[in-house]
Amino acid sequence: MSKVYNRIFTEKKWQEVNKYNKNLMEDFLLELKSQKKKKGTIDQYRNDLRILFIYILEELDNKPIHKLKKRNFRDYSLWLQDKNMSSARVNRLLSALRSMLSFAEDDDEYGEDIEINYAAKVKGLTKEKARDIHFLTMSEIMTIYNSLKAQKKYQQALLCALLIDSAGRRQEVYQVLKNAISKEANFTNEVIGKRGKKFRLFYNDLTLEAYDLYMAQRGEDDIDSLWITKHDGELKQASYESLYAWVISWRKILKDELNIDKEFNPHSFRHSSLELLNTGEHYIAKKLNKKFSLQELKVYAHHESTDTTSSYLINKDDELLLEAFGLS
């Protein structure tokens, strides 16, 4: 969650963080790199551990981490919860801490200082009940898209378009490159999905329209990624969390323009895209005058089975029963 990260982390604070703690983090990240961990995974560990060390800076007198005990890490867990982070988010931050201290325990240099991984003694939070899926109608999606265009937020309009066109996961859409979209093709560069599966994402008219607007606005730069942010006047690749924050901010558009409250997230667009293609309400389906079959959607979503694809759609059992008895 980039909003939480950006609220806690600043370069000024980071400059003040204990050098021992910084060195431990960098050595741990180098170890992850040597294990061939993905760049995105390593970046996530870095962000998670920066939150930890800024907490230590502000709440624990910037002590070197080897001087902390179990109660300190328990208090850290409580502090994270006070920031209204989800159980999954808190558990991930604690997991990053445990992994780093586990590395330190076994390391020749740090093992003398850190003989016991006290963080391992702090229990994780109980997993929260799965959230309800919030489906979006094509009309609601177009309201979001048109509002972003009107605000000249063309990059976010492109994200909205690509999510609904491709039914891609956030991690897949994040991998799309700047030069991978053109009128001559309908597929992006190759991305890596769940379980290491490689494929290209499909896009259509909405993506092409938003892409042209965005690239004209963005101009020339040497960043390969499709997604960028500007920090202190400097362009850089947007973080993975930025895409999440942008999508969450669109909830306000539906509230302001349609008086609709929906707690949707990036994955809602994957569900909604498949549902709209299945019912024929997606603009692509209307253009083709067809409803996509479950088998076609399985291929579209890069699922292993139609059972998985079916689970992404709205359950229509009640409608089928009413229709069977002539009550619909």
Tell what function each PLM region has.
Residues 8-11, 25-43, 47-131:
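N-terminal core-binding DNA-recognition domain of tyrosine recombinases/integrases
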Residues 108, 162-175, 280-284, 290-291, ...:
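A short, glycine-centered helix-capping/turn motif at helix boundaries
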Residues 125-143, 195-206, 220-224:
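DNA breakage-rejoining catalytic core of tyrosine-based enzymes
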Residues 138-170:
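Basic, Lys/Arg- and aromatic-enriched nucleic-acid-binding interface segment
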Residues 166, 171, 175-210:
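Conserved tyrosine-mediated DNA breakage-rejoining catalytic core shared by Y-recombinases
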Residues 195, 301-327:
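Catalytic-site neighborhood detector that most strongly recognizes the C-terminal catalytic loop/helix
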Residues 204-261:
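Active-site/catalytic core of tyrosine-dependent DNA strand-transfer enzymes
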Residues 245-299:
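Short, basic (Lys/Arg/His-rich) helix/loop patches that form interaction surfaces
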